[in-house]
């Protein structure tokens, strides 16, 4: 039963790799285009998973793949360019058997191994995650402050940020701390960037003072 899914994903990857339009390759376009090798693999996988209504399952499995490849022992045997291909294949087969990944995820791993692209796996996972984030209507937002925010302040900030979103969009907030900005905050939401840090204000003041003098 896995053969059609395997051959289908394989055809789609080759389709994007060669940019040749084929009548049988009716691809489901992802909500956002990710360029490069990783983008081509992720797009083909997104299309195949979407057709089978397994986007969430594949996303979960890919995150697990990324986690596994970060393990020192696995990385040493699978991502090391000096390790024989046969050894890598054996290691991957053992991992796939143990994790019981779906045919879609299994075939992606096998394709990456076959094409010598295992080093691009993390990039493919990242590209697929980006597609899924947009698919869910998530808007990435990063807030950087000099020190951790209090719960009340964070709650108020979330309310303000959500007011800028359109209906159906979901705020995906990440809060970071960076003492070097001295105070205030730096906000990046979607393609918008606002620097309200004390460091930048001081730099602007310093520049203005030098111009006056």
UniProtKB/Swiss-Prot annotation:
A motif (SIFI-degron) lies at residues 5-23. SUPFAM superfamilies: N-terminal domain of the delta subunit of the F1F0-ATP synthase (SSF47928). GO terms for cellular component: mitochondrial inner membrane; proton-transporting ATP synthase complex. The modification N6-succinyllysine is found at residues 90, 158, 162, 199. Residues 1-23 form a transit peptide. It is found in: Mitochondrion; Mitochondrion inner membrane. It comes from the Eukaryota. Its main location: mitochondrion. Acetylation at Lys-162 decreases ATP production. Deacetylated by SIRT3. The modification N6-acetyllysine is found at residues 54, 60, 70, 73, 158, 162, 172, 176, 192. InterPro entries: ATP_synth_OSCP/delta_N_sf, ATPase_OSCP/d_CS, ATPase_OSCP/dsu. Keywords: Acetylation, ATP synthesis, Hydrogen ion transport, Ion transport, Membrane, Mitochondrion, Mitochondrion inner membrane, Transit peptide, Transport, Ubl conjugation. GO terms for molecular function: proton-transporting ATP synthase activity, rotational mechanism. Component of the ATP synthase complex composed at least of ATP5F1A/subunit alpha, ATP5F1B/subunit beta, ATP5MC1/subunit c (homooctomer), MT-ATP6/subunit a, MT-ATP8/subunit 8, ATP5ME/subunit e, ATP5MF/subunit f, ATP5MG/subunit g, ATP5MK/subunit k, ATP5MJ/subunit j, ATP5F1C/subunit gamma, ATP5F1D/subunit delta, ATP5F1E/subunit epsilon, ATP5PF/subunit F6, ATP5PB/subunit b, ATP5PD/subunit d, ATP5PO/subunit OSCP. Belongs to the ATPase delta chain family. HAMAP family: ATP_synth_delta_bact. Subunit OSCP, of the mitochondrial membrane ATP synthase complex (F(1)F(0) ATP synthase or Complex V) that produces ATP from ADP in the presence of a proton gradient across the membrane which is generated by electron transport complexes of the respiratory chain. ATP synthase complex consist of a soluble F(1) head domain - the catalytic core - and a membrane F(1) domain - the membrane proton channel. These two domains are linked by a central stalk rotating inside the F(1) region and a stationary peripheral stalk. This is ATP synthase peripheral stalk subunit OSCP, mitochondrial.
């Amino acid at each position: 039963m896995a053969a059609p899914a395997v051959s289908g994903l394989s055809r789609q990857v080759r389709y994007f790799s060669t940019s040749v339009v084929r009548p049988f390759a009716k691809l489901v376009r992802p909500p956002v285009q990710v360029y490069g090798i990783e983008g081509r693999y992720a797009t083909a996988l997104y299309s195949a998973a979407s057709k089978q209504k397994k986007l969430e399952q594949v996303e979960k499995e890919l995150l697990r793949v990324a986690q596994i490849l970060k393990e020192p022992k696995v990385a040493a045997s699978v991502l090391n360019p000096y390790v024989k291909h046969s050894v890598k294949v054996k290691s991957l087969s053992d991992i796939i058997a143990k994790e019981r990944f779906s045919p879609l995820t299994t075939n992606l791993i096998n394709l990456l191994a076959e094409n010598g692209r295992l080093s691009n796996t993390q990039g493919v996972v990242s590209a697929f995650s980006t597609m899924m984030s947009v698919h869910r209507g998530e808007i990435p937002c990063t807030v950087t402050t000099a020190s951790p925010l209090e719960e009340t302040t964070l709650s108020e900030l979330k309310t303000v940020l959500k007011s800028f979103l359109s209906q159906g969009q979901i705020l995906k907030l990440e809060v970071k701390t960076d003492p070097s900005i001295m105070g205030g905050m730096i906000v990046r939401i979607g393609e918008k960037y606002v620097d309200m840090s004390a460091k930048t204000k001081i730099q602007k003041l310093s520049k203005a003072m030098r111009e006056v003098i």
